[in-house]
Amino acid sequence: MSEHSPQGTGANVPASDSPLADALWAALGTVEDPELRRPITELGMVERAQAVSEEDGGYVADVKILLTIEGCPLKTTIEQDVRKAASTVEGITRVQVEVGAMNADQRNALKSQLKPERINPFTAPGALTRVFAVVSGKGGVGKSSMTANLAAAFASRGLAVGIIDADVHGFSIPGLMGIREAPTRLDDLIIPPAVDAPREHGQVRGGAPGGFVKVISIGMFLKGNQPVAWRGPMLHRALEQFILDVHFGALDILLLDLPPGTGDIAISMSQLLPNADLVLVSTPQHAAV
């Protein structure tokens, strides 16, 4: 029997003396967490990976993965991806996967790995993310549709894109992007849901692989048609949390879908993200400009 048994989240696992175990670990390294978009081997999600010999001369891949939270909605997807990856290893004739969940210490280690400090990653020294605020003078001119289409276009070119739906009182981005699931919460760290770049006939439009869009919206935290009656400081704190406590990871582009006009939200965003470029959406009507 040969195995890799990493200790701790994000551990660098030394090469074993078994080529089969190394090949199994390398195969599992091609599996990414669908939300974090990083290999599960880097995130400490593989507790056990071993190749066990069988009587017929083949080997069974015995793998245990740890989900970030109990009841993770992506359990089936991750398990299927692990099975598929392990089955590609030459010499592996059967795959068995055990699924567990991280304990508190493992989650804390993961949080420290993902976001060691509560800082604004988009204004920090060396930040490379290009930030665009999509704005309009009035509602109903297609601002949110423009935001969603820009995100899809950027992602189709292989870029990592984030959207903050800052239109708190008229959020629509989750629906436009086809996102129904809620964000994953690691205590006070929020992991936004992600969608892959648009595809046509199985191919990413534009031919560039790897693009995706991560979305956060107040609508993901509300039940049904629950209204939002926030103003001033409450709005600022909510938007600040979207920037400081949401782990987008390394983004090429961040899009802000702002509400129409120049109210509290626009003022807060200009303070939180002063480096944002503006994309003004309008129609030919005088009232829109």
Tell me the role of every PLM-derived stretch:
Residues 87, 151, 155, 270:
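Gly/Ala-rich phosphate-binding loop of Rossmann-like dinucleotide-binding domains
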